[in-house]
């Protein structure tokens, strides 16, 4: 080492261990709020421990899911709205796990950035904890990675991991779906966490950008609304009424996601529904074709449930009693070769 050179430190290289410790202290109470029966140990261990609830499940099957929030994260960074993106992260994972009929048990997150901003990271993880609370899942661990030179200034990335449990003979896999079954839509809170690469292009065309008003609200509020988490109302429903299949409407919209849970030879016939104003604004501002809208966005439908036709009214009533906006979207019919598996038909 030369006479004018100082000794190197990890902090000088861009990694601040003290900031990481401060973050852990800041989020401790938020994480505690997510605790539930089954959690063993506390924050800071090398591995999160969770006891499988064999007292409530005869043949428990664990269901896992992992996801991110796509380029909605870039819009969150550009608008400085970091508190809701953590809810989005949990929702994308927990709603996927829920589709099998599984109860979310626990969640882990991965937060990566070039330089740790404790305020921003704490806001994100508060959102993750809130999402876990909504899903009924415990936040039992996570990783905060500070990697100098890997990300643009102020940028970060997120990934989430959720594990749930379902009784083996109660797994919902679509095998019981039959012609005549009813389709029930659960309302989305907005575009959720899909289609944001196209949304950002639309915003470039809007003269006022994210400050544009749609239906009396800044479009940024509508676009950054956290993804709805359906775990509690849907679990309540499947414990009381038969559900043959569920589809989480994410990337690819209804045309791509609904067929994933339908047996061969069956298709979905949807009745037209009223799209929330933000989707019509996106369509008009971006001059986006209807088919492209349906393949990119949820267009107001966050989840679809397939139930026996004779149970549709009871299912709607129960979902509405638990606070969901739900309506009859259509029905299952036979699928003719060469025709789309999902069709919007005249009422």
Curated annotation (Swiss-Prot):
Main subcellular localization, coarse class?
cytoplasm
Q: Which UniProt keywords apply?
A: ATP-binding, Cytoplasm, Ligase, Nucleotide-binding, Purine biosynthesis
InterPro entries annotated for this entry?
PurM-like_C_dom (IPR010918), PurM-like_C_sf (IPR036676), PurM-like_N (IPR016188), PurM-like_N_sf (IPR036921), PurM_cligase (IPR004733)
E.C. no: 6.3.3.1
Show the GO cellular component annotation of the record: cytosol
Keyword Ligase set for record: yes
Q: Which domain of life is it from?
A: Bacteria
Which cell locations does it reside in?
Cytoplasm
Reaction(s) catalysed by this chain, per the record, are: 2-formamido-N(1)-(5-O-phospho-beta-D-ribosyl)acetamidine + ATP = 5-amino-1-(5-phospho-beta-D-ribosyl)imidazole + ADP + phosphate + H(+)
UniProt pathway annotation = Purine metabolism; IMP biosynthesis via de novo pathway; 5-amino-1-(5-phospho-D-ribosyl)imidazole from N(2)-formyl-N(1)-(5-phospho-D-ribosyl)glycinamide: step 2/2
- Name one matching Pfam family: AIRS
GO biological-process terms attached to the record: 'de novo' IMP biosynthetic process; adenine biosynthetic process
Q: Which GO terms describe its molecular function?
A: ATP binding; phosphoribosylamine-glycine ligase activity; phosphoribosylformylglycinamidine cyclo-ligase activity
Leading EC class: ligase
By sequence similarity, the record places it as follows: Belongs to the AIR synthase family.
Which HAMAP family does the protein's record reference? Answer: AIRS
Output this protein's name: Phosphoribosylformylglycinamidine cyclo-ligase
- State the organism named in the record: Alkalilimnicola ehrlichii (strain ATCC BAA-1101 / DSM 17681 / MLHE-1)
